[in-house]
A protein has these predicted regions:
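Residues immediately within or flanking Cys/His clusters that coordinate Zn2+
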Residues: 5, 24, 110
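Short cysteine-rich clusters marking metal-coordination/redox-active sites
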Residues: 8-11, 27, 113
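Cysteine-rich micro-motifs
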Residues: 21-32
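Short metal-binding segments enriched for Cys and/or His
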Residues: 32-46
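Exposed aromatic-hydrophobic patches
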Residues: 62-63, 97-104
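Short amphipathic, basic-aromatic surface patches that mediate peripheral association
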Residues: 63-71
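Short, aromatic- and glycine-rich surface loops/edge beta-strands on solvent-exposed regions
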Residues: 106-116
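Edge beta-strands of extracellular beta-sandwich domains
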Residues: 115-123
Length: 123
């Protein structure tokens, strides 16, 4: 079963669900929102789709063909690499980039923009 991400609008908690449908997840007293990813056919892809380069066991991820801004009110919050065995997420503090060392075979990379939502590229 593929990864499903759920988001709390109040506290910004993100939950990864790999089995089940997650339909009963709640946080801060309300149901969590299922995060649906955009793709390369959606407007804004050039600043939001992850660009991935693999070097050995490392994945170098840059968000956007044109680098995404990192402003207080508009930024990439995190990058997530999904693997066949789970995944790894890294917060983006100063730059919309990450060097990740995933355990297992990477199958997709996600980036979350606080203004434009979740973006995904399959590997």
């Amino acid at each position: 079963m593929r990864l499903k991400l759920f988001f709390c609008r109040h506290c910004k908690t993100v939950v990864n669900v790999r089995s089940g449908d997650g339909s009963r997840l709640t946080c801060c007293g309300e149901p969590m929102e299922h995060m649906v990813s955009h793709n390369s056919f959606d407007d804004g892809w050039e600043k939001h789709l992850p660009v991935v380069e693999r070097v050995g066991d490392e994945l170098y991820v840059k968000v956007g063909k044109t680098e995404h801004p990192m402003l207080e009110d508009h930024h990439i919050d995190w990058i997530y690499v999904e693997t066949l065995r789970g995944g790894i997420r890294q917060r983006c503090l100063d730059s919309p980039t990450a060097v990740l060392h995933p355990v297992g075979i990477p199958v997709a990379v996600y980036a979350y923009c606080n203004q434009h939502g979740l973006w995904k590229v399959n590997l």
